[in-house]
């Protein structure tokens, strides 16, 4: 019994040493995040595309399928991420003005954003997976979720009533190949 406890403590020391060595080798103690492209479409099969500099969701067919916007993602925590389009040059943000909370596209480079800067929190979304679908909640405005309208060709927006069935808040989110 005494031998097992001795072996256990040596094993713990070894693991602590290895784990400490792993994190000391990186400047911030975590792996640098890289941008990845994802396809996104709602549970009603509407994809995102840009119309008049506004992100909308609709049914793209034929030659219009090339209009589909890929979502650029930079993970910042296990379940939080920045979302952008156009190679990360335009980012989705949650903006609150008075009683109004809205989604907007901002001309900001996604790789310049930092989870440690308070002003960048409006660009962060918390990803929640439920089976094959994903929802995105604003980190800056808790309770507000990325959504699409039931009708096609309407702006992608935010809702604080995800369970009312008025807006679609469940998406398929798949890494682009």
UniProtKB/Swiss-Prot annotation:
Query: Which intervals of the chain form a coiled coil?
Result: none
Signal peptide (from-to): 1-25
Q: Which GO terms describe its molecular function?
A: cytokine activity; interleukin-1 receptor antagonist activity; interleukin-1 receptor binding
Under the heading InterPro entries, the entry gives: IL-1_CS, IL-1_fam, IL-1RA/IL-36, IL1/FGF
User: Does the entry feature the keyword Signal, yes or no?
Assistant: yes
Superkingdom of the source species: Eukaryota
Q: Could you tell me the Gene Ontology terms of the biological process aspect for this record?
A: inflammatory response to antigenic stimulus; negative regulation of interleukin-1-mediated signaling pathway
* Subcellular location field: Secreted
Q: Where is it chiefly localized?
A: secreted
Q: Name one Pfam family in it.
A: IL1
Glycosylated at which positions?
109
Task performed by this protein: Anti-inflammatory antagonist of interleukin-1 family of proinflammatory cytokines such as interleukin-1beta/IL1B and interleukin-1alpha/IL1A. Protects from immune dysregulation and uncontrolled systemic inflammation triggered by IL1 for a range of innate stimulatory agents such as pathogens.
UniProt-recorded name of the protein: Interleukin-1 receptor antagonist protein
